[in-house]
A protein has these predicted regions:
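ATP-binding/phosphotransfer module of carbohydrate and carboxylate kinases, centering on a glycine-rich
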Residues: 1-63, 73-76, 94-102, 116-126, ...
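Glycine/small-residue-rich loop that forms an oxyanion/phosphate-binding "nest" at active or ligand-binding sites
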Residues: 105, 111
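Short beta-strand segments
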Residues: 7, 65-69, 107, 131-137, ...
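A charged helix-plus-loop insertion that forms the helical arch/lid used to bind
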Residues: 77-88
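A short acidic/small-residue loop/turn micro-motif
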Residues: 31-34, 87-88, 155-158
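Short glycine/serine/threonine-rich phosphate/pyrophosphate-binding segments
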Residues: 13, 112-115, 137-139
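Short, charged low-complexity linear segments at domain edges
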Residues: 142-158
């Protein structure tokens, strides 16, 4: 039996046919429309196209799994609110079921990515894992015993909104001091720009050709590798914030594995070694406690499709 995985993003909707081993047989991409009725119709058309091109009969499809950004109630099959898409109470399960006649399940996009990496990716072979996705904010997913744990009404698993600083920086969620204000890719860029303005002789200026608007998540890291003192300080401080965010979750769940994804994860072992060392030194239980394995996500842009399909694992 095959499964359909649908990864809804702010810019595009990726749909794929996935086999029982988590391999994508074929996939397609369409632009995300802000009209939810159009989105559903486009997904239905993409599924029909994939079935036709692969010679797959609809009777061979176990179900459609959907990953979507925002607040998702998996039990009700509803995207309650997606701020990036300005969607409210999007009944995706009911809508897709009506169009296709197939069973449909939905979960938050970060949750399905975590599920994909646990079942088929970086943490394959581990039952319990937590994934942190470092981007505009900090997405996260928790997998316990091979299944997504999303809390009551599917509203939990938000590591980006644990508090690092009481009365700290104002977060877009309305609270202050949230982790994503310090450990997201957006925060890293902000910290990098601040350090550059305070250190006019920093190699970080060379990396961006003197244009501070070209700063991205690589600027401080690549300059740090060349020994630039200001960049080293930015990276070490950022890794401290990220490590403390991870520790907050480790000390509650103590998973078998931690997965780091998103743009910043492209730094690979350079990032991972710093975070691993910090967490092993400062976690509850110190050297006597069992260590959670740490990995960089490996499925990339396919994690959303694979994880969504795995809702029918």
């Amino acid at each position: 039996m095959y499964r359909i995985g649908v990864d809804i993003g702010g810019m595009s909707v990726k749909t794929g046919i996935v086999d029982e081993n988590g391999a994508i047989i074929k996939k397609t991409v369409t632009k995300t429309d802000r009209n939810t009725d159009v989105v559903l119709e486009n997904i239905k058309n993409d599924i029909d196209k994939l079935l036709s091109e692969t010679g797959t009969d609809i009777s061979e499809i176990k179900g459609i799994g959907v990953g979507c950004p925002g607040s998702v109630d998996s039990e009700k099959g509803e995207v309650i609110y997606s701020n990036n898409l300005d969607w409210w109470h999007f009944l995706v399960v009911k809508g897709l079921n009506a169009l296709t006649g197939l069973k449909v399940r939905v979960s938050n996009d970060a949750n399905v990515a975590a599920l994909a990496e646990t079942l088929y990716g970086a943490a394959k072979g581990y039952k319990d894992a937590i994934m942190f996705t470092l981007g505009t904010g900090i997405g996260g997913g928790i997998v316990i015993d091979g299944k997504i744990y999303a809390g009551g009404h599917s509203q939990g698993a938000e590591p980006g909104h644990v508090t690092l600083f009481v009365n700290g920086e104002k977060c877009s969620c309305g609270r202050r001091g949230c982790a994503e204000m310090y450990a997201s890719a957006t925060a890293l860029i902000k910290q990098t720009k601040k350090a550059m303005l305070e250190n006019k002789d920093s190699k970080m200026w060379d990396f961006v050709g003197g244009d501070i608007e070209k700063v991205d998540g690589r600027t401080a890291f690549e300059s740090s590798k060349k020994g630039d003192p200001a960049a080293v300080k930015v990276v070490d401080t950022y890794c401290m914030y990220l490590s403390e965010t991870i520790l907050n979750m480790l000390n509650i769940f103590r998973p078998d594995a931690v997965i780091i994804g998103g743009g910043v994860s492209a730094q690979g072992d350079y990032l991972l070694d710093k975070v691993r060392a910090y967490c092993e030194k400062d976690h509850y239980g110190y050297i006597l406690a069992p260590k959670s394995k740490m990995f960089i996500a490996k499925l990339g842009n396919d994690a959303g499709i694979i994880g969504a399909a795995a809702l029918f694992e």
